[in-house]
Amino acid sequence: MEIISTQKFILLTLATVAFLTPHGACLDELMKSSLESREDDDDKYYETKDSILEEKQRSLNFEEMKDWGSKNFMKVNTPTVNKVPNSVANLPLRFGRSNPEERSIKPSAYLPLRFGRAFGESLSRRAPNLSNRSGRSPLARSSIQSLLNLSQRFGKSVPISLSQGVQESEPGM
């Protein structure tokens, strides 16, 4: 390979610059002209679109809009709902019951209300089933006595038969 002299190198560089500069200027002009033409086209497009929209907006009348509203919408009536009384609404129909009226609203004997009226009734039903031996034992006597105290504390008097049963078991110890 030959070493290129500086004179030849400078000459080659100037020729390349001279050759590429006009083409670059042409490309710039072409680029500018295409961009400017696009901007002009865009402006024209938006101007025509705006003018069409303005014409459409000017041509609308309120009467036409009222006509459109009445034609396009259908009025739908809401279905009527059968109202169920409150006492029946919460009763499920299952376990072989056909009518909700079969279920009583009163609490059952084995499910007393919390601190309520069925507390003393459930005690009176269970107390006669105690044998005499259980009445004599101190454990049974203390449990019955605590039940009596509970019922009195919450404002419910225990039936007389239960209190008499406890009193009878005390003297015979």
Curated annotation (Swiss-Prot):
Secretion signal span: 1-26
Gene Ontology biological-process annotations: negative regulation of gonadotropin secretion; neuropeptide signaling pathway
Subcellular location, record wording: Secreted
Entry keyword set: Amidation, Neuropeptide, Secreted, Signal
Propeptide: 27-82, 98-103, 118-140, 157-173
Domain of life where this protein originates: Eukaryota
Signal found in the keyword field: yes
Keyword Signal in record: yes
Tissues expressed in: Specifically expressed in the diencephalon.
UniProt modified residues of type Phenylalanine amide: 95, 115, 154
InterPro entries the record matches: FMRFamide-related/fGRP
Stretches assigned to coiled coil: none
Any one GO cellular component localisation term in the record: extracellular region
GO molecular function terms attached to this record: signaling receptor binding
Protein role: Hypothalamic factor, responsible for the negative regulation of gonadotropin secretion.
Similarity annotation: Belongs to the FARP (FMRFamide related peptide) family.
Annotated protein name in UniProt: Gonadotropin inhibitory hormone peptides
